[in-house]
Amino acid sequence: MTVQTFGELIDRAADFIAGHQLPSGAIPWYRDGVTDPWDHVACAIALDLCGRFEESTRAYEWLSKTQNPDGSWWYYYQDGLPKEMAKDSNHSSYVATGVWQHYLISKDMDFLRQMWPVVEGGINFTLGMQQPSGVVWWARDYKDEAWPSAPLTTSSCIYQSLLDGVKIAKALGLDSPEWDEASQKIARAIREKPELFDTAGDNLRGYAMNWYYPVLTGLIDGERAREHIRGEWGEFIVEGWGCKCSLDQPWVTVAETCELSMALARIGETQQAKTLLDWVMPLHDADGGFWTGVRVPEGIVYPPDEKTTWTSAGVILATVASIGDGELSNTHLKG
């Protein structure tokens, strides 16, 4: 596909996302679906990349209004109310990445100042679950009791969110040495003590995100990152189709394929990144959205009739990462 064609495609995908935004500013997965803070931020980043500043600003205003006093958000919201009463550490810190990307694109310093208390609260909630080993517990339940497990994927994302939080603080003339220190503790734990992660009993290591997220967030880079990706390529990739969500499922997903594409773009493998994007183009629907995934080799859309806003956001982010340049290239996690 040409750059112009990709531009038209992501503009239609942005229309799809914006068309699902509620008057409150929340961006649910689909009509009458739930809104979770992490995917909501991913959609806001995608809207920013397409110049939809009004919609993205409303998305962040929703986050500001729904943030809990302790800096967290509930896991899901629906019809304006909390749906699942858990507080995810990754959800709370990820707002920093979204706010920083909005600033990089819009250059709106007033927005950065207005969102600072939200960012500060979210990150401080997350760091309240960091352990001396560097790991950050997954979440707290409705009783405020921590879930004593640290998924590698969410920990990698928290690492990047902390770096973005430090950048926000610096842009505002503030110091945040404890955030920088916390990010380095996470990095050391991931690089030196991987056995500390994914200890809850679930086979989280069988998920593609655990494979590529340390590369996507810059925890593994250079030739080591390329070797890391090659090491499990044959396990997760179905040639011509995309990336499996998990090893035990016979389907590939657009979101995972796009995140892997971003990871490849980050380490300079842009041609391979574009190839992955080409593979998911058949899942682009007439309304601008993308089907969540497809069963292989049958080629049957799966789950049936599901087109999520965050899937379209993933396509936008990956497209910019693979064909963009300058600061906006890899803007999902880099800036």
Which residues fall in each region the model found?
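Well-ordered alpha-helical scaffold segments within catalytic/enzyme domains
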Residues: 1-3, 41-55, 94-111, 156-174, ...
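N-terminal beta1-alpha1-beta2 module of alpha/beta enzyme domains
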Residues: 20, 29, 33-41, 45, ...
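Residues within HEAT/ARM-like alpha-solenoid scaffolds
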Residues: 90, 110-117, 153-156, 174-181, ...
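Active-site neighborhood of glycoside hydrolase catalytic domains
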Residues: 152-196
